[in-house]
A protein has these predicted regions:
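Gly/Ser/Thr/Ala-enriched C-terminal appendages of enzymes
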Residues: 2-159
Length: 159
């Protein structure tokens, strides 16, 4: 919509292969929401004690998330605050579907996908986040290492 032109599901290049390894890339914008999250990453859904999602968490691909102890994270909107996930569990959201041009698992039917989404909405996502009028925000937080890498790329831009 013209009144809210940010569309969060547009894919942009996040890394470039150079000499056998990948270098993270970032797209910068005057609109904070349009700045991309660089590099290969993992996305986890974090669940509170009630079993509902409290946030999603982005980490670099190499990072391991351990929720056995309080896990420090960065809220990109308030990075100066020291925040921790405590008494939480997590689930990695991304799954490898294609490798070397070949499927790694059979495709799901439309009905399987529909059923999976309905189950998630019913048992994992707060009703307050699902309403159309004044929905609560679903937070997207970052590991400290991932946040530092993103800020380093932003601060080292030429121009």
């Amino acid at each position: 919509a013209k009144s809210d032109p940010v569309f969060g599901a547009v894919y942009k290049i996040s890394a470039v292969e150079k000499d056998g390894s990948y270098e993270p890339r970032i797209k910068v914008s005057e609109t904070v929401e349009k700045i991309t999250n660089p590099g290969f990453k993992r996305v986890y859904r974090i669940y509170g004690e009630e079993g509902y999602a409290v946030a999603d968490l982005i980490t670099s691909f190499e990072e391991e998330v351990n929720m056995d102890e309080p896990y420090r994270y960065v809220d990109p909107e308030k990075p100066w605050k020291n925040r921790f996930f405590e008494n939480c569990t997590c689930k990695e959201l991304q799954q490898l579907v294609i490798k070397d041009g070949k499927r790694t698992q059979p495709p799901r039917s439309l009905e399987e996908i529909r059923s999976y989404v309905k189950e998630q909405l019913a048992s994992e996502i707060w009703q307050e986040e699902q309403r159309f009028e004044n929905p609560h925000k679903h937070y997207l937080d970052m590991s400290p290492d991932y946040y530092d890498m993103k800020m380093s790329l932003l601060h080292n831009l030429r121009g």
